[in-house]
């Protein structure tokens, strides 16, 4: 069962049980996946489970009747379901909850029905049926009750099957037999009700001597055994799909009549088999049923030969009723088995693989009866031949030719070009899918390998390469499943090697992955230095003001100026401006259900003003068949990692620019230098935090994980392993970079917000102080403005002073509040950082995330923050105020990282 199917089933179950809140569906899904074991059905376990439920049930007869009905239809997974239900009967608490839930649902349904009936007020006269409608209804019921009901039902069933298969294969419609094939009953070979073998009036058999009675009855039986009514033994009309019954002349001698009744089941079985052969020979029932009907027709011919030989003996006067009973014994067993199989296939409405499953299970059930098992093996081998032809084409060439929709693998029309556009990629997962009902029971264990084998070869064929398996060998049905396993294993190994070599060598998968790592995971720093120097001014603009072609040109220039110029795949790198910032995107992916995130999720993207720095990301052009591995899901993960690291790099550059601009502080007086000392310390702490986080992500998460990925790719044996290794690499990077934990993500975003706002504040204050210094220096050094007359000089000085005062009227207030502002930034940053360290410590111990412990040790290398945590903990215990969280600082103004353009 696929992961998406488990998600769907668990959510539907929670909805039916009306479970809200609690641990959520993810907990139960993980529990189910971790405790999933194959159920091995045995006769003893199935019988004991059935008995246990029957004893528990209030109506055991109804339960056993329903079980037998489903069993006769060859229902899949019936025994595992019964076993699960028997286990539920042992859990009293679960039973009590289910009973209460069923009672509440019944009450709600009754209330809904009551409200609907009361809300609709229909006059009493309107509920009466008019005479005309009553007459039409009587005519319809009369037509249903006619003898052609069975024929009409068969015709309706054929039409349904034909429409279903034509819908699946819209380009190739099923052929149709002409109408006269079904309208002429004499062509069927079964009894013609109401038509005798002769127009002569039969003599009353009771008036004949015993020898004459026996001779007449033998002649009648020879007719009846080939589907023709006799004079004294006649077939009764069929009632639905029940077995054929016969009417024997009551005047017949008692001993003879008893022997006749023993022989008549052969004629009844012959009638059942003949009708089955004619019905299943229609195109709508598929090639497997065609082959089964053909094999049965061969056995029926042998039966007719036997009857002809008996007729020859009868004409020679050598066939008595006792001899007929003796000679018919082998045929009785054969026809009984054929009729039983025909009835089971009809009841189960079996097609394709389900027919083969029924035949295979029946062959095993006759293990103690060699002749019956040999007969079933003959039928199964004949019926499986067309199925195995489709299977051989699939596992040896990657081609599906299944005009009757009987094969276990179903093809869906999907375009491979969509694989690099659609986030929910369906090509690899849903282009070819398993149809559980069409898997023969003897191939159940190999179903996944059969699916993968054909998919691998099909991918190579889609690329224009013709593939033919060199170890191809005809597959023939046998009870020894090892024969199938060996052939499928050989085909699977060949297909895996062909596709893997094709992707690795011809399509250079590893080289493409290294190229993506170079850009998305910042493998080479010189390219990003060039690009951010060139594009930073453009990226500070709002998204709607950015010109994408200009960014593309700057990217191209940065690529050509750096060592990335040697990358053969550099032209596949593109610019992508996302509609949401990283935090919003991640919270949507993680499905966080807080009010704020819900509001953000339903907000129009244009309502959230984004800068280019928040929206910027790379994209990568991936062509088929590499898009099977580097699909849209994988690229989205790469983009999340890139945006996370790109923003960290931007914050680092901002802090470094503050460090550069802080050189002007040396020119100020001692009080100003004291004010700046606290800002310098805070800036260094922020820079230390950002740089250590970047070092952790790049050198302690991504590099080791990348080396593991490269090692695994070298040892991969098939494309599914490659997919698993690549997805595991991305998931590990996302997890260890704190992008899958909502709590850590929120705290980290607040820290980034504080850092960005601090840099904006410092740059603004530094510019203001620098302007003040320049104005003062000009006045002191020059005294007068050169090149101007005295009057003009005074006017210019006054105008400049007025403008300066207008722009910096609050300079004194800004200077006086600078120390308080820095203290507030320090308090916020420390509170959020302590919160992050505390959470990291908890996750590293409780969730065994040992990698996060290294972040804690790096950020708190000298115990500075540990001491603060202990001090805050002591203060909290002294104040005894549990309602005030210690590790939380003042709330940030917005949950997402905001950048103020300079």
UniProtKB/Swiss-Prot annotation:
The protein's name: Gamma-tubulin complex component 2
Lineage: Eukaryota, Metazoa, Chordata, Craniata, Vertebrata
Pfam families: GCP_C_terminal (PF04130), GCP_N_terminal (PF17681)
The family this protein is said to belong to: Belongs to the TUBGCP family.
GO cellular component: centrosome; cytoplasm; gamma-tubulin complex; microtubule; microtubule organizing center; spindle pole
Places the protein is found: Cytoplasm, Cytoskeleton, Microtubule organizing center, Centrosome
InterPro entries: GCP, GCP_C, GCP_C_sf, GCP_N
Function: Component of the gamma-tubulin ring complex (gTuRC) which mediates microtubule nucleation. The gTuRC regulates the minus-end nucleation of alpha-beta tubulin heterodimers that grow into microtubule protafilaments, a critical step in centrosome duplication and spindle formation. Plays a role in neuronal migration.
GO molecular function: gamma-tubulin binding; microtubule minus-end binding
Signal peptide: none
